[in-house]
Amino acid sequence: MSKAVGIDLGTTYSCVAHFSNDRVDIIANDQGNRTTPSFVGFTDTERLIGDAAKNQAAMNPANTVFDAKRLIGRNFNDPEVQGDMKHFPFKLIDVDGKPQIQVEFKGETKNFTPEQISSMVLGKMKETAESYLGAKVNDAVVTVPAYFNDSQRQATKDAGTIAGLNVLRIINEPTAAAIAYGLDKKGKEEHVLIFDLGGGTFDVSLLSIEDGIFEVKATAGDTHLGGEDFDNRLVNHFIQEFKRKNKKDLSTNQRALRRLRTACERAKRTLSSSAQTSVEIDSLFEGIDFYTSITRARFEELCADLFRSTLDPVEKVLRDAKLDKSQVDEIVLVGGSTRIPKVQKLVTDYFNGKEPNRSINPDEAVAYGAAVQAAILTGDESSKTQDLLLLDVAPLSLGIETAGGVMTKLIPRNSTIPTKKSEVFSTYADNQPGVLIQVFEGERAKTKDNNLLGKFELSGIPPAPRGVPQIEVTFDVDSNGILNVSAVEKGTGKSNKITITNDKGRLSKEDIEKMVAEAEKFKEEDEKESQRIASKNQLESIAYSLKNTISEAGDKLEQADKDAVTKKAEETIAWLDSNTTATKEEFDDQLKELQEVANPIMSKLYQAGGAPEGAAPGGFPGGAPPAPEAEGPTVEEVD
């Protein structure tokens, strides 16, 4: 059984799954949740990832990072990044044209790249899988939106590397959902529309599935529409209501906003199954309690335009794939936001009453498919995966600039990848000594409106009239969507090439290695912290336990002995209260001192047969402190 997993790295939540014995397991995290918030929190003492980070976001907004997926592989001055910055409670800074997140961590200011933040979330998913499978997990298939361009895909791959994962492949989320769905669909050709409305992004894809072969026909979407936008509508609605009722504006207070947002997210989820729900937040702002309620109808009205706008990309993919909506055989809903009844109704009505499929949990479908793909790539011999072949597509057209700034496409969008295309070009002027090959991605006719991926020079062309030299340009896109462009002058055989992993966005090998080392360091610190806490808990538990045992010992011990142990135990408890941040060694030393006083006296009690069963916790009698893993309480304090 392979230990390869599928990871859905989402904007707001992530999910990990594993395929074995012909079935997929969605793996729950240490909190028992099948999805984990894509949040990382930094405090004075530790780094938190997932639920723990999200739960403290209200108290620590400036140092709790989320939505890293909106930043990954982008430039700082990208309009999307600039727009998002206004809404982030944490600070973004410009480092060599790339966004980095600045936080206070353990008393110092630290900068992290979006890749590092995503790698922490991926690391958390890796640990979740490891504790469930009871073995190391190295290989993973990680998913990205169909819309992600080259540098975003590459940056996601880098994040996996930093987390210590070997990323077998980056696959499109809708493709993954289709695999989850298509495993058992063998036979005639079917057109499947994947409608994926997640926490932060919206993607629609049209696939054809035939004999286990998947082909993506078209993709469209909105990188900025999802559950968070519906939460925002609720948040704004309640800010206005609070203003009306209390004549106060709470939108200036980050903590109040965060608490309100958490309540709104909860209310939204409740409204998917109930017609109305109440929102109750004690002391929300300036000591004022906020108690109110909201109905499903009001929520639908607040988000009406957003819900309606989800149909535009649906129309676009049908146009691109040249299909009528009646030719769509199956509709698959993916992403937690498709649980909203109004969204389901809009989709059903658009397809003239055709019911969408919901057999797979919408927020788990992508990880499910990624796990199947991981099993295939690591050679799982299951009959279920035997005949499955995956064809992905290039999300945007790829081409080069020709005379007059024209975009000449070599690979049109929605081409199946991996793919390779060649075309012959020539010089534009007589005796031109070289050509500049500029590679663009995008759909516009002029290159200035498209996205420059990279460029290189092919020089040393022998003097000749214009149009005579033959320069063959080859575009080769591999299965991860990474592009190699080469050019050869046929007369001389001179050639040059470029691998486009979007250099501007690409982390260098050194950067990645540095970040991998840093990730290891953080992991060690996290482990150190949990060992420190274990020692502290153990000391506390033993001190209290001794106190209790002594108070119940009655006349089996002399008063002086009882006093000695009680006094030492109380001293220890007092010391604990005033030294919560002590090191593991200090806790262990205190335990030694406590045992030096208590052990001889406790031995007397045992000989007198006085200690109740299990009263004396680990290490009695016996001098050395036991290993904290083995002893001490195994439950954690909850907030």
Curated annotation (Swiss-Prot):
Keywords associated with the record: Acetylation, ATP-binding, Cell wall, Cytoplasm, Isopeptide bond, Nucleotide-binding, Phosphoprotein, Secreted, Stress response, Ubl conjugation
Entry keyword annotation includes Cytoplasm? yes
Renumbered residue ranges of the record's region Disordered:
605-639
Sites of Phosphoserine modification? 20, 551, 603
Keyword Nucleotide-binding in record: yes
For this protein, the record's SUPFAM superfamilies field holds: Actin-like ATPase domain, Heat shock protein 70kD (HSP70), C-terminal subdomain, Heat shock protein 70kD (HSP70), peptide-binding domain
Q: For this UniProt entry, what is the primary localization, expressed as one broad class?
A: cytoplasm
Q: Name one GO molecular function term.
A: unfolded protein binding
Question: Which cellular component, as a GO term, is one annotated location?
Answer: mitochondrion
Modified residue N-acetylserine is at which positions? Answer: 2
Instruction: Kindly list the places in or outside the cell where this protein is found, as annotated in its UniProt entry.
Output: Cytoplasm; Secreted, Cell wall
Q: Where is this cross-link: Glycyl lysine isopeptide (Lys-Gly) (interchain with G-Cter in ubiquitin)?
A: 556
The UniProt entry's GO biological process terms, in alphabetical order, are:
cellular response to starvation; chaperone cofactor-dependent protein refolding; negative regulation of DNA-templated transcription; proteasome-mediated ubiquitin-dependent protein catabolic process; protein folding; protein refolding; response to oxygen levels; SRP-dependent cotranslational protein targeting to membrane, translocation
What highest taxon heads this organism's lineage? Answer: Eukaryota
- Please give the start and end residues of each transmembrane region: none
Coiled coil regions in record: none
Spell out the family assignment given in the record's similarity comment.
Belongs to the heat shock protein 70 family.
UniProt miscellaneous comment: Present with 364000 molecules/cell in log phase SD medium.
Write out the function statement from the record: May play a role in the transport of polypeptides both across the mitochondrial membranes and into the endoplasmic reticulum. A functional difference between SSA1 and SSA2 proteins is expected. SSA2 can participate in the ATP-dependent disassembly of clathrin-coated vesicles.
- Give the quaternary structure: Binds human HTN3/histatin-5, a peptide from saliva, and mediates its fungicidal activity. Interacts with NAP1.
The entry's protein name is Heat shock protein SSA2
Task: Give the organism, scientific name.
Answer: Saccharomyces cerevisiae (strain ATCC 204508 / S288c)
Taxonomic lineage: Eukaryota, Fungi, Dikarya, Ascomycota, Saccharomycotina
